[in-house]
Swiss-Prot record:
One of its GO terms (molecular function) is RNA binding. Belongs to the class I-like SAM-binding methyltransferase superfamily. RNA M5U methyltransferase family. RlmD subfamily. The lineage of its organism: Bacteria, Pseudomonadati, Pseudomonadota, Gammaproteobacteria, Legionellales. This is 23S rRNA (uracil(1939)-C(5))-methyltransferase RlmD. It comes from Legionella pneumophila (strain Corby). [4Fe-4S] cluster binds at residues 77, 83, 86, 166.
Length: 444
């Protein structure tokens, strides 16, 4: 029998917010049922309207704030209410950190079934103009005869929020969004550009135009003139990721760069490579990870999900040898390139399936005293399940998803005999609910 959808009550409701969800939405309890309301803060009394009725929870749209929280601040971005790029600009920066730290510790307790012996002080950076990588959507609107450039709408990802600025983006692109829009508006084929990837190094900013059809000579000229006037490297992507090429300057090498000044290391990377979006926080994160590793000259370290060597190369300056393993062959090539350009010789890199620890062991027949793990959001489940075959005395786990960190912590602590010494958050993404964290495990 077909289920009948519950009818929405469209009259406004009033409720007090009692908590925050993992994604930063306010939680109200209405007749014992959780209602999630974007933009509401704990302690506030809000007026809202139901937008979705589910079996176990409801969702609502914030209409007004009857009793505001002292933690509430005015969002800096004029597009904040619609844009899906940020979710916490209405909360003070200090409270954002407390929310993320509390969320991490709650997950470690609930799903990791343990608590750290100590909690690290949060790592923070500048809250604005920190983001060095982003993807801007573009769409030419026939009715308006103008181009929209922006991020997806928070409540309807099918649509684009047209923006004139973005205060979390690298300061250069923040001020040039309006010029990007004007560029596309003047092109002969205004439907050609589907999206624009932004990637910034320490000294240069690159734009990758995803062109759905070949550019006309006139449009190529306009892009060159734009790049020259506003000082961008421009890449074109006419097909898949392997089709990206440097379009302007035509004689330029394809790499951007960033530096870890404390270690006198400079990394070169392609705009499509994975790099941390927040350069200032990344520098602090690398230093904290190395401090937690407590490296000795005799240590041989395994760096899993090593990427282009962001942790491997600075660690190599403090130990006997580092072996980096990465699933992406292109990143392994980049890691070797960076080791060579920085004259670091006590590192080796391998491409392997990181869900198969035995494949890693067969590639690298070495004993490791310490391991650093920096996995994607899916975590490192297969690695921690097979950690006995590596048997390190110390593990530093850098996480971009506290839920999978908590899951993997449960295995390490309650099945593999490790102790969670310390853990804490790193605010890689201010004004969003994304939680980056770091944890130290010691063999019990």
């Amino acid at each position: 029998m077909r289920k009948v959808k519950p009818k929405l009550n469209l009259t406004s409701q009033t409720a007090r917010i009692v908590n925050l969800s993992h994604d930063g939405r306010g939680i109200a309890r209405v007749n014992g049922k959780a209602t999630f309301i974007q933009g509401a803060l704990p302690g506030e009394v809000v007026e809202f309207q139901y937008t979705r009725i589910k079996k176990d929870f409801d969702e609502g749209k914030l209409l007004s704030i009857v009793e505001p929280s002292t933690l509430r601040v005015e969002p800096k971005c004029p597009h904040y209410q619609m844009c899906g790029g940020c979710s916490l600009q209405h909360m003070s920066a200090e409270e954002q950190i407390r929310f993320k730290q509390s969320h991490l510790l709650d997950l470690l307790s609930r799903y990791g079934h343990t608590e750290p012996q100590s909690v690290l002080s949060p790592l923070t950076s500048h809250h604005w103009n920190y983001r060095n990588k982003a993807r801007l959507s573009t769409r030419f609107v026939e009715k308006k005869q103008s181009t929209m450039v922006g991020f997806r709408e928070r409540n309807n990802p099918r649509f684009i929020t047209e923006i004139n600025q973005c205060p979390i983006l690298n300061s250069k692109i923040d001020t040039d969004i309006v010029h990007l829009r004007k560029l596309i508006d003047t092109m002969e084929d205004k439907h050609c550009i589907a999206q624009i990837e932004v990637a910034a190094g320490d000294n240069e900013v690159a734009l990758i135009f995803r062109n759905l059809s070949p550019l006309t000579e006139q449009d190529e000229l306009k892009i060159r003139e734009f790049a020259q006037q506003f000082q961008y490297k421009v890449f074109l992507q006419p097909g898949g990721l392997d089709s990206v090429f440097c379009f302007y300057p035509s004689d330029a090498h394809a790499y951007l760069s960033y530096e870890l000044p404390d270690y006198q290391i400079t990394f070169q990377f392609h705009p499509n490579d994975f790099t941390q979006v927040n350069a200032e926080l990344n520098r602090k994160m690398v230093t904290q990870a190395i401090q937690l590793m407590e490296l000795k000259n005799s240590d041989i370290v395994l760096d899993l999900f090593c990427g282009l060597g962001n942790f491997s190369l600075p660690m190599a300056k403090h130990c006997s040898r580092v072996i980096g393993v990465e699933g992406n062959k292109n990143m392994v090539e980049r890691a070797y390139m960076n080791a060579k350009s920085n004259h670091i010789t006590n590192v080796d890199f391998y491409a392997a399936n990181l869900d198969d620890v035995m494949e890693v062991r067969n590639l690298v027949n070495t004993s490791f005293s310490k391991v650093l793990i920096d996995p994607p959001r899916s975590g490192a489940l297969e690695i921690v399940k097979q950690i006995d075959s590596i048997d390190p005395e110390r593990i530093v786990y850098v996480s971009c998803n506290p839920i999978t960190l908590a899951r993997d912590t449960d295995i390490l602590v309650n099945q593999k005999g490790y102790v969670l010494i310390t853990a804490g958050v790193m605010d890689m993404f201010p004004h969003t609910a994304h939680v980056e964290s770091i944890a130290l495990f010691q063999k019990g």
